[in-house]
């Protein structure tokens, strides 16, 4: 285990307080005032600041209610014997001195910041293997326990994802061989691409689950659900909607270009050339002329088929009867955005525990696991039912059954964890 060192913030805190105390003690402040006053009379007291500070300490230590005080000060080469110097002090003198001290402290603070941050960085990079060894060992032990706990649902999900990927590859090859004769070439092109993306994201969900990141896995399921809903609508509504979806790449590019152009200077990026801007403007005119003004909106590709000039994902979801999953979609959205719900409620925190989750957890994996299996089965079924045959119908039913088994196993393990936690709390009570 790496040797513990004082935290850089603590080092700065102590150094800053020491500097602050030395600069703001009464004798130091008064000595600063005396230095300024002597300078006004042609005497460079800064060369003898320590002597002035001792004189200031004497003045402050001597109890007096008089408006005037005197002290003797020997400054070699500055004051001859017997010379009297009158110094008048008021609030302005103190304010000016305090301003000077404040400036000095700020300057000193920056120096301390620079020095300590450089030292801290050197310490961090000095021996990373020793520093990370303890964390790595803890992480490895956690993942072994996690794998043992969730072994069965993980295995079933692996089988499910592998099967859907295999079906996708076979189906993609078969459908594309038929595409020259098919009227729904665009549908095949879009749905196969959406299916491929969904399988890819399913792999990301698996990786997050196997590392104990329930909330991250849930956020990636949200993407799987969006892909599935989109594929369903396009497959149901046919070639025209598929062609609009493909054409909407242009609308998305126009929107992205306008946003880029707005912030290019701030980000110190090269702005879009006048030639490219003119080309994008012409594309916007062409798309609006061909598909109508609503087409340029978000989800504008679905505006015509939904008879809605400003469709949303929720309206597409409802059109394919998957709005029943909206509560889970909202739950996943909470993990993505910075809202209060997602901050105070985390899937990886069990029950009513009020902890701050800053790493992996062995609980809460069931939601993303079972929903990922469901969405993957749904979109693979969409792919299978384009030009359906006996095999595709059978495999769609197999996927439905396998998805149910995945769900059962994930829920079973989560309930066992919750039951064991209740028993543990009961024993501690």
Predicted feature residues:
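Alpha-helical solenoid scaffolds that mediate protein-protein interactions
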Residues: 198, 205, 224, 231-232, ...
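Long, hydrophobic/aromatic-enriched structural stretches that serve as scaffold segments
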Residues: 166-234
């Amino acid at each position: 285990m790496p040797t513990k060192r004082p935290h850089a913030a603590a080092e700065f805190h102590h150094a800053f307080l020491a500097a602050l105390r030395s600069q703001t003690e009464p004798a130091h402040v008064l000595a600063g005032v005396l230095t300024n006053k002597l300078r006004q009379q042609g005497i460079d007291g800064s060369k003898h600041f320590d002597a002035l500070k001792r004189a200031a300490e004497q003045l402050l230590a001597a109890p007096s209610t008089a408006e005037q005080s005197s002290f003797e000060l020997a400054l070699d080469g500055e004051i001859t014997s017997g010379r009297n110097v009158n110094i008048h002090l008021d609030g302005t003198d103190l304010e000016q001195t305090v301003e000077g001290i404040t400036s000095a402290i700020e300057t000193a603070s920056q120096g301390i910041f620079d020095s300590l941050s450089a030292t801290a960085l050197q310490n961090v990079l000095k021996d990373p293997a020793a520093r990370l060894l303890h964390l790595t060992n803890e992480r490895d032990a956690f993942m072994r326990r996690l794998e043992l706990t969730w072994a069965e649902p993980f295995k079933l999900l692996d089988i499910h994802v592998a099967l859907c990927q295999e079906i996708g590859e076979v189906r993609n090859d078969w459908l594309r061989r038929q595409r020259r004769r098919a009227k729904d070439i665009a549908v095949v092109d879009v749905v196969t691409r959406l299916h491929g993306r969904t399988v890819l994201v399913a792999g990301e969900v698996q990786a997050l689950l196997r590392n104990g990141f329930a909330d991250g896995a849930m956020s990636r399921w949200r993407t799987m659900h969006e892909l599935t809903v989109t594929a369903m609508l396009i497959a149901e509504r046919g070639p025209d909607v598929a062609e609009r979806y493909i054409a909407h790449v242009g609308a998305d590019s126009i929107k992205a270009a306008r946003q880029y152009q707005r912030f290019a200077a701030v980000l110190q990026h090269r702005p879009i050339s006048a030639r490219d801007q003119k080309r994008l403007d012409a594309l916007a005119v062409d798309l609006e002329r061909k598909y109508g003004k609503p087409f340029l909106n978000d989800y504008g590709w679905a505006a015509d088929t939904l008879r809605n000039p400003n469709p949303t994902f929720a309206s597409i979801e409802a059109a394919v009867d998957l709005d029943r999953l909206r509560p889970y979609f909202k739950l996943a959205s909470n993990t993505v955005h910075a809202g209060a719900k997602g901050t105070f409620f985390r899937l990886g925190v069990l029950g009513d525990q009020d902890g701050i989750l800053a790493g992996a957890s062995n609980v809460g994996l069931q939601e993303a696991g079972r929903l990922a299996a469901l969405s993957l089965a749904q979109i693979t079924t969409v792919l299978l039912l384009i030009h359906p045959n006996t095999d595709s119908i059978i495999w769609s039913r197999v996927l439905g059954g396998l998805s149910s088994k995945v769900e059962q196993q994930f829920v079973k393990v989560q309930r066992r964890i919750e039951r064991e936690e209740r028993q543990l709390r009961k024993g501690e009570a």
